[in-house]
Regions:
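Intrinsic low-complexity, intrinsically disordered or marginally ordered coil/linker segments
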Residues: 1-126
């Protein structure tokens, strides 16, 4: 089960990482992955009709971060147009917000590898 907030909503954070697109604010929930067809691999995350969510663009966007995560982990230099990456990520987040059940809060956060400051803090997607 996802993190239960005082208002009864579950909090999901979009923050790309290696083989993950986001996480719950609850420590006992594993990070969220996504199948190559764009299906979100978590039965507790559902759309307005209670059905699983499929977003191929979320999968493609998340996969872009993987070479940077690897480079960062071994101390190799990397380059990324963070402004563009985050604009596309926010566009995806807003699209997800439109189809995501109102049982969820949706947040967007920059990955730890991003030192640009483009996204300086976790942002609520409304």
């Amino acid at each position: 089960m996802l993190y239960d907030k005082a208002d009864g909503k579950h909090a999901i954070v979009i923050c790309p990482d290696y083989d993950e697109w986001g996480y719950s604010l609850s420590e006992d929930v594993p990070p969220f992955s996504i199948a190559s067809d764009g299906r979100i691999d978590n039965k507790d995350i559902y759309d307005l009709d209670g059905k699983p969510i499929v977003m191929p663009e979320l999968y493609e966007w998340q996969k872009e971060i993987e070479p940077i995560v690897v480079a960062f982990s071994v101390g190799e230099p990397y380059d990324k147009d963070w402004d563009d990456y985050h604009q596309r990520g926010l566009d995806i987040a807003h699209k997800l917000r439109k189809i995501l059940s109102p049982d969820f809060e949706l947040w967007y956060e920059a990955p730890s590898e991003d030192k640009s400051g483009t996204i300086s803090s976790r942002t609520l997607i409304e």
